[in-house]
């Protein structure tokens, strides 16, 4: 489970781009070499700190919902926080080998997903794979290059998942944008401003603090 992280994210432009909008296609040995090199970078990642701005576009709203995000990853434990424009924490997600816990402070609710039972990560958390073969197993993968940027275009092979497509824009293997488009029409765009590999992260930084009296739900049970 190489944190499929990130992000829980997810992320994406106001309209689905055609292949020609993403740059020149990279195929064959060049594509394999890029994916292999990216996998090697991920295998060497022991920890990660990321700061980003997220725009969430919903069909029923004219304006995007904007939030600031911060993510910490150490080993196989991840903590992800979103704060709205009023400075209020909207959600905190903690993921480890056993569970995904999502705390909504404004709703006084904690959602718990038992990974030992479901045996799979949510789609939005499982897109980063250290193994290119694993990536190709779960997604149709296309790679494009333009102006020093590489864009991975991912389409889930499982037609039952809510995700329609995902795009990851990288410069020198560092993500610049993450884009997710769901079949419901929801689009999320994540602009990454800080992406630091292997920083020092303490166990305390990965704690999820939930007040007593918080409502606990298990949405997949």
Where are these regions (language model features)?
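An acidic-aromatic
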Residues: 70-123, 188
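Envelope-exposed proteins and targeting segments
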Residues: 46-48, 67-69, 76, 89-91, ...
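Gly/Pro-enriched, hydrophobic low-complexity segments
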Residues: 111-113, 134-220
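Buried hydrophobic packing residues in well-ordered domains
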Residues: 38, 50, 80-81, 100, ...
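N-terminal leader/targeting segments and the immediate start of mature chains
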Residues: 18-64, 210-221
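Positively charged n-region of N-terminal signal peptides that target proteins for export
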Residues: 1-4
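Anionic-ligand binding region
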Residues: 125-130, 137-138
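Bacterial N-terminal signal peptides
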Residues: 6-14
